[in-house]
Curated annotation (Swiss-Prot):
The keyword Cytoplasm does not apply. Induces the expression of gadE and mdtEF. Could also regulate the expression of other genes involved in acid resistance. Induction: Induced by EvgA. The gene is ydeO. Residues 137-233 form the HTH araC/xylS-type domain. Residues 154-175, 200-223 bind DNA. One of its GO terms (molecular function) is DNA-binding transcription factor activity. This is HTH-type transcriptional regulator YdeO. Pfam families: HTH_18. InterPro entries: Homeodomain-like_sf, HTH_AraC, HTH_AraC-typ_CS, Tscrpt_reg_AraC-type_HTH. Keywords: Activator, DNA-binding, Transcription, Transcription regulation. GO terms for biological process: DNA-templated transcription; positive regulation of DNA-templated transcription.
Length: 253
């Protein structure tokens, strides 16, 4: 799968010309680099260690976090951070690049931690979403960051630095619309919440619906069943799974 960006840990200071501009990079500095400009750093590879991030990892990170979207005048091609625990970060990158990386969930948490170093930087979300290959994927990732937000087409355009007419055109080419993406994202979020949240009112609110009755209507239309019905099915599945587990334990004894 294509890489979206890399996190670079500099262990020897160096000067470089990146995109026709001179930079001085310090020992211990951390960079997040858009894959589109990664080649500009290749001549200096002996000065740093790095870990690459795939589109799938970025999508999961955006879905699991709740970072406020902050627009910047010009999309950044790389971000800089300092004052991080360099010893720990060095060990993390070494592990993530090693053959010992056989614990998927643990590795994923380490990858998310590396990304989170830059969460407060302006342009962070823009750099990540610009690396997602499809336009509809970029829109979906933005919505997934905060499903309860009253998203408008203009908000998405501001995040992606694109006009409303062009965004509509690109989404049409991918056979979808902003409204459809917003609905799908909220409905999937609702379905996930139903597994752990008993209150339909709270679920509706967390999915951006001011009216619980309209949320129930939209949910039923989308999935063919009401939220309560789906919740009941999940509970039955969970109960059946527990009984099966108890039966297997009894047989083992």
């Amino acid at each position: 799968m294509s890489l979206v960006c890399s996190v670079i840990f500099i262990h020897h200071a160096f000067n470089a010309n990146i995109l026709d501009k001179d930079y001085a990079f310090s020992d211990g500095e951390i960079l997040m680099v858009d894959n589109a400009v990664r080649t500009h750093f290749e001549p200096y590879e002996r000065h740093f260690k790095e870990i690459g991030f795939t589109e799938n990892t970025i999508k999961k990170y955006l879905q699991c976090t709740n970072i406020q979207t902050v627009t910047v005048p010009v999309p950044a091609k790389f971000l800089r951070a300092s004052n991080v625990p360099t010893g720990l970060l060095n060990e993390m990158i070494a592990y993530l690049n090693s053959e010992e990386r056989n614990h998927h969930n643990f590795s994923e948490l380490l990858l998310f931690s590396c990304l989170s170093i830059f969460a407060a930087c302006k342009g962070f979300i823009t750099l990540l979403t610009n690396g997602v290959l499809s336009v509809s994927g970029k829109v979906r990732n933005i919505v997934n960051m905060k499903p309860a937000h009253p998203w408008k087409l203009k908000d998405i355009c501001d995040c992606l630095y694109i006009s409303e007419s062009l965004l509509k055109k690109k989404l049409k080419q991918e056979q979808t619309t902003f409204s459809q993406i917003l609905l799908d994202a909220r409905m999937q979020h609702a379905k996930n919440l139903i597994r752990v949240e008993g209150s339909v009112n709270k679920i509706a609110e967390q999915c951006g619906y001011a009216s619980t009755s309209y949320f129930i209507y939209a949910f039923r239309k989308h999935f063919g069943n009401s939220p309560k019905r789906v919740s009941k099915e999940y509970r039955c599945q969970s109960h059946t799974g527990m009984n099966t587990g108890n039966t297997m334990n009894a047989l083992a004894i």
